């Protein structure tokens, strides 16, 4: 989450309600009991949209595990943890983080772990998302473009996998947001907005979100 980071997650959900949000999402909620998050969602009537798999060992710089060939066991444990947590709080999706890796073995590993995630998520009605990260903020991250993500989604061949289209990352990676949004809409499961280049409030910066939101509405 980008807002109310000074609060614990249940209180941040309550703050979102007071700010007239009707839904929330979070990154890594695992230091908070799922029942406490579930209670805050029930109290406020807000919907939890989604959460991420653990990054791994953040002290050594991990940013996901699922494309790292030698860490499949850890990656699948993180997937299981995320899906089990999600089963308690009923979000729409789980974002499976790839991590820092490259090459054919990393690709093969990521596809295999995503197939595992999709199969594990089906009984819970969850969608699995993947998200390209830009090379300025996450140099060396395995999933580095929307084209690569599209190829992987096609290879996984699961009904419950989709693209997280983070406008901030896509603009820094490739630009041309309007056309990319139109081209990729059939595989997009979730869209995120933030200003470019400072990743702040979307009401300023290099991208006109007024235009982009209107374009998205027309596409839908």
PLM regions and their residue ranges:
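N-terminal pre-domain/capping segments
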Residues: 1-87, 150, 154, 158, ...
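Glycine-rich S-adenosyl-L-methionine
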Residues: 149, 208-209
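A short helix-and-adjacent loop within the catalytic ATP-binding
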Residues: 41, 121-122, 217
